[in-house]
Every structure is written in structure tokens, then in C-alpha cells.
Amino acid sequence: MPTLLQKHEGYLTGHCLVAMPGMGDPRFEGTVIYLCAHTAEGAMGIVINRELEEISFPDIVGQLGIQPTPFCDDVRVQFGGPVETGRGFVLHTSDYQNEGTLSVDDSMALTATLDVLRAIASGDGPMRVIMALGYAGWGAGQLDGELKGNVWLTVPADRQLVFETAVKDKYTTAMGRLGIDPRLLSENAGHA
């Protein structure tokens, strides 16, 4: 995975994918995915607008032997994607760094170690977090093909969209930034 996180010109690391209406895959219908990595070798991202109601962050840290504290109460657990759904990934602001942290850009990072969970529980964690179970992954050229097939739109990501916009509003906010009303979109498009 480290090779995927190197900077590559012409790729969409640090952007958001926005699912086109009628994309045909219920796992991704209506989703916004923050791309943590996108290179010729593949892509990896975290769905940022699908909360999991059946599990809480205090439950997760408790199961891992970390004492839940009031700092855990505001962290929501999200479906990060269909790959490795039993594994946790924390997308967060870059104010927190440790040995296992992978910087995506100057403002956001990804950590998938117990250290970040301990830091969150102790109040020493990142300012903003998304705790995700699983991730969205694409093999070499797969995402590029989906982009050419009009499965996804792309929008530059920022802290407001990723962390501060309400989960239920992220899709319409991302579409709105593109000047698009999703109700008026068709999944069919022509190419010249």
C-alpha cells in the first residue's frame, strides 16, 4: 500500500468520487468516496457518507481492550467500503501523526493502527476523524475505466466536505459544488 500513497501527477488522490445516479452497484449508490490513493497500480478510498447504525465507536474500542471515554462518544462508525470490512481505518486531519500514519495531502491522513484509537480515546487524537470499517479498492486501471464509463464524478475534497458537512448532506453538497442537481442527471452519456 505505501507505493499507492506516493504523489502521482494526473491522478485523483485527495479528491472525492461522487456516484452517478443509477450506477448499478447498491454498495456505492449515492456515495461520496474520499480517495486516499490513486496511481497506475490502483486506487483506495473511504466512503464518507454511510454511517453504520448497528455499531458504535465505544463498542469498537471496548472490544479492542481500550477503555471508552467521553472522547469516544462523538465518533461515528461508517461503512468505508466492501474490502476488508473487519478492519478499521481512521481518516483524519493531519494534526495527528504516528509511525503508521500515511499522509494523503497537507490536511488529511489515514491511520489503521490501534495507536490512533488509543489517542482518540485519551483525547490526544486528531481534531477531526472518520472511523470506517472497510475501504473501497480498485485494481490497476479499474477506477480509470469506471471514470471513463461515467460511473463517478469527481470533486476536489476539503476539510469542510469530508469532516464538517453532515453525513446525510455530503452527497448533495458534493453534487452542488459541481453545479449539479442529481435528480436531473442521466447515467447515459456520449463520447465524441
From Swiss-Prot:
GO cellular component: cytosol
Pfam family, one: DUF179
PANTHER family, sorted: UNCHARACTERIZED PROTEIN YQGE (PTHR30327), UPF0301 PROTEIN YQGE (PTHR30327:SF1)
Cited InterPro entries: AlgH-like
Domain of life of the native organism: Bacteria
Listed SUPFAM superfamilies: VC0467-like (SSF143456)
Family named by the database record: Belongs to the UPF0301 (AlgH) family.
Record's protein name: UPF0301 protein Rru_A3059
Record-annotated membrane-spanning stretches: none
